UniProtKB/Swiss-Prot annotation:
Function: Transcription factor which acts as a transcriptional repressor. May also function as a transcriptional activator. Binds to the palindromic T site 5'-TTCACACCTAGGTGTGAA-3' DNA sequence, or a half-site, which are present in the regulatory region of several genes.
Polar residues biased stretches: 606-617
Protein location: Nucleus
InterPro entries attached to this UniProt entry: p53-like_TF_DNA-bd_sf (IPR008967), T-box_DNA-bd (IPR046360), T-box_sf (IPR036960), TBX2/3_TAD (IPR022582), TBX2_3_RD (IPR048387), TF_Brachyury (IPR002070), TF_T-box (IPR001699), TF_T-box_CS (IPR018186)
Region annotation Disordered: where it falls in the sequence: 270-433, 606-660
Organism this protein belongs to: Xenopus tropicalis (Western clawed frog)
Protein name per UniProt: T-box transcription factor TBX2
MF terms in GO: DNA-binding transcription factor activity; RNA polymerase II cis-regulatory region sequence-specific DNA binding
Composition-biased stretches (Low complexity): 618-633
Subunit text: Binds DNA as a monomer.
Amino acid sequence: MRDPAFPGAAMAYHPFHAPRPADFPMSAFLAAAQPSFFPALTLPPAALGKPLSDPSLAGAAEAGLHVSALGHHHQAAHLRSLKSLEPEEEVEDDPKVTLEAKELWDQFHKLGTEMVITKSGRRMFPPFKVRVSGLDKKAKYILLMDIVAADDCRYKFHNSRWMVAGKADPEMPKRMYIHPDSPATGEQWMAKPVAFHKLKLTNNISDKHGFTILNSMHKYQPRFHIVRANDILKLPYSTFRTYVFPETDFIAVTAYQNDKITQLKIDNNPFAKGFRDTGNGRREKRKQLSLPSLRMYEEQCKADRDGAESDASSCDPAPGRDSLHSPLSTEPSPLRLHRSNREEKFGADSDQELDRREVRTARSHSPVGHRSPPSSPRLEDRGKDKNTPEKKSESPESRKDGGDNVFSRSLEKDKGESRRKEDSKSDPECGSLSKETFAPLMVQTDSPPHLSASHLQSLALSGLHGQQFFNPLNAAQPLFIHPGQFTMGPGAFSAMGMGHLLASMTGASALDNGSLSSVQGATGAATFPFHLSQHMLASQGIPMPAFGGLFPYPYTYMAAAAAAASAMPATSAATTMPRNPFLSSTRPRLRFNPYQIPVGIPPSTNLLTTGLSASLNPGSESSKPGSSRESSPIPDTPGHKRSHSNSLSPKASMKDSINELQNIQRLVSGLESQREVSPGRETPK
């Protein structure tokens, strides 16, 4: 067999078989010495040991056993023979290897080539690429490369040149990088240059990806190997032809030391954009893209300054945000000019700000009366409002408009949103909103799985912003309760001393618990767990008593939400579910909102809109799926019952009224009889 093309002593190749020397010891590829990685194979330091001269010990080397552990030579006869992995018959070939991009390598070599190594792995530039000729066209070859230490010195870059700084650090076992196309025929290898551009260098000694592990500030030499074999498993027993190109040696660094090397890589590597002054980096792209959008933004603000009757929404950054530009003044807010100057000076600081500015610019060309849906997260808008001191100087009109913006965000899925918003501005009952900006009170619950869709459908609190217990609603955050934390039943609140609140609350005097009480009677015990996390309430500013009850005395605005949950109308899933996309799932939702909406709502709107009308309407019994769910335009008064003008018949209306009276009486009487019962368990009536 042909000797390797690089037979120097530095190669440290040692034979297994005495008559025929091979290139690598078996222990380099076995897990007993070091775990082998494919396509990267390990060469442990044991490869530099003394060659095995006795042919009978070759099997012991394969098994990864230490030679001295074998007391007698006859034990090696029991090990598996190597005959099954003998190489193929020799084929006459004379490989020739030339380095691609030799001129570029020479330029780097004159300055002292540096290769950056990182924890995550970094590719080489210039890439190691060779062209092979002289192979047998039919025989299969495996092409691979490795990187070995060029000397035993550690270097440092001092006075614009590399100099020896001391003795080299211990080297990690070197890994062989097998070309991904291996094995392939000689004809395939000779058809095009062989590139090892996917080889990655790392300084992570615990690397699990098969990258080549190098030490920083050490000099290394890449080596190229050709092995004639048709299977990777035959590599340990095959002859390696090794080729070394001295101009490819380099010093591994974690950051470039020589500025000339840095410039040379920038000039030749199309992917080296990190060092360019006028490159296509992310910050440069943002600055270039921000210039036209800033000009359009300034032109729009100038147009707003000229037109005194421009609407606040035409240049509004986001619908949910309080108006930065007062509709009654002709001068823009100082905040707007300040932000414009800041963006001109620094450009966009992040991709998110760039996207937000583009969206704002696109929205500025929308019609005056159009209000687009919100494009930024609610918490982000609220955080910007808290940091805006100029917001306090707004007129009551703009503050009221901001309240409407918050209100429109909570009902953004409704079709008649803009028309209801204009009507609500002229509603005399919304005058109280001009004093303080109320955040919407929203409680969304999902019913437990044992409830059908007809038990919990919709719930409305109408006109409750004028109630006494809704005064603490000037908090900056709406109340959100996770569905799994808030499931309620009618008896849970009456047992907590809240029955009289139901009887006296405006807009909630019409109660219907027919289906709820029937469910309780059927199951024999209350199946409505009442659970609300203490930390959830505390984070929203709701007081929580120490003994574990839900509401302290006096009642807060949560009491009204919880009390009205007992007044849920029982509806039929057959009449409401198909036309309501929001309630198309089998888990009904509840939503509380203190704001009032006019009654003129088309029948096609969803249940949330219908439930938020001027009064709380009672649903029919679950046995009457055809009864109407439309609300009455006549507001409730505490002493009088409202008339059901849109029921199916007077008999159904009278029956509903009787049921309502019975339910109110049952809830009030439950105050005394169920005071000892815990909120989670209630005896059925």
